[in-house]
Amino acid sequence: MLQIKTEKEELDCGDDQNPKESSAVPLTDGASPEPQPQILQIKIKEEEPDYEYYLPTIKREMDPVPGAASPLAESEILQIKIKEEEPDSEDDGNSAATSAVTFRDWDNCWSDEENWDDSRPQLNQYNSDFPGSADTANTPAINTVLSRGNGLFVVNQEKRVATNSSCQSDTGHVDCSVGSEPSGFICCKCGDSFAHHSDLHTHLYACAGHNITSSFTNASEEGQHSHKNGGVLPREKPFKCTVCGKCFTLKNSLQLHHRIHTGEKPFTCTECGKSFAQSCSLQLHSRTHTGYNPYVCTECGKRFSSNSGLRRHMRTHTGVKPYACKECGKFFSDLSTLHRHQNSHKGEKPFICTECGKGFTLKDSLHRHQRTHTGEKPFICSQCGKSYSQSSNLIKHQMIHTGVKPFSCSECGKCFAVKDGLRNHQRVHMRRNYSAAQNVAEFSL
């Protein structure tokens, strides 16, 4: 709580003046003396009353300079001295912090705060009785209110005391971190307190629309409250999809979700004409044309255009299958594979071919099937010019040119370029083993 006392005294012309506390206004020769702006000397003292909390008391003394009897002009110069001291103290006050600040006029002394960027918290409300106020010893505690966006940041002066040198940081944010109490920014909705205004700004999103009545008196209680809520308070999702009922926190996320239902794909590839619903998907797709594959597998050296593609590939080496089907308990390494499997339980085939009426669970499967009707083969081998309707068939064909045979037989060690070739080869071993087992059975009889 700031207590402000203002006292006016007239200086004696015969007393010695401190050069830092007074100034003389020269007059030009031959010109009549014009009314000069009055120079005021203001002394602000912060004192500590005798009760539990440290509440500074500010005394203000305005001393007019001799020879300046004209009324105050708009360009008046104020010299402010801020001095902190404790009442009833036996010290001589040499240890008190003192600083001098010079302003053009009182109306413009808050110009720095008024010119702050909107993204920074601005001083929205302060003690209106501060300039030239009377004794405010009996006034209630002052809560400085800072605004940022639609939220309010309340700085409780009873818990956090701001000195004259720390009221504003170098970045323009109001810093009231002086004091022993860790909680200084209080949510106006639920009463929760935070040490930094950025933490409160994040909390306001979580607190919106929820009747939260928790309050903290220290940092440990705040940490326990955060731990009980999983570290993050529930966030409001006011934007609801009218088609499927899914909710989102941001309106932009809802608009992107609507494209799933409408089929809108505004982002088109200039190379192949393929369209995408999001720009990030188009950027990843463009790497297939440029050949930019920055993500490399440390096991086999295979390269990928996205980090997610590399993570999915790494599961083939580790054997991790984190996605389980709730119907049959079967595990899958990829989420899209699980979705395709779940459609087999549902029996849903929403994508129907207009040529033959065949249904498919995925839209991509329908596109691949339609190429059998149109005869389109967009995937062309760069070595021999042979074309294919599916990219997987092109990859299998390119292994003939590269000589790569990653699939080996566990019985004889023979290698194959494609997995289907290995399966056909393994049937030979199965027939031989079956014939040998029959011969052994006949011989035993």
Curated annotation (Swiss-Prot):
UniProt key word Oxidoreductase: no
Gene3D superfamilies xrefs: Classic Zinc Finger
Location of region: Disordered: 1-38
InterPro entries: Znf_C2H2_sf (IPR036236), Znf_C2H2_type (IPR013087)
Gene Ontology terms, MF aspect: DNA-binding transcription activator activity, RNA polymerase II-specific; RNA binding; RNA polymerase II cis-regulatory region sequence-specific DNA binding; zinc ion binding
Entry annotated with the keyword Repeat: yes
Keywords: Metal-binding, Phosphoprotein, Repeat, RNA-binding, Zinc, Zinc-finger
PROSITE patterns in UniProt: ZINC_FINGER_C2H2_1, ZINC_FINGER_C2H2_2
Zinc finger residue ranges, C2H2-type: 185-210, 239-261, 267-289, 295-317, 323-345, 351-373, 379-401, 407-429
Modification type Phosphoserine: residues: S89
Function summary: Binds to RNA homomers.
Protein name: Gastrula zinc finger protein 5-1
Originating species: Xenopus laevis
Record lineage: Eukaryota, Metazoa, Chordata, Craniata, Vertebrata
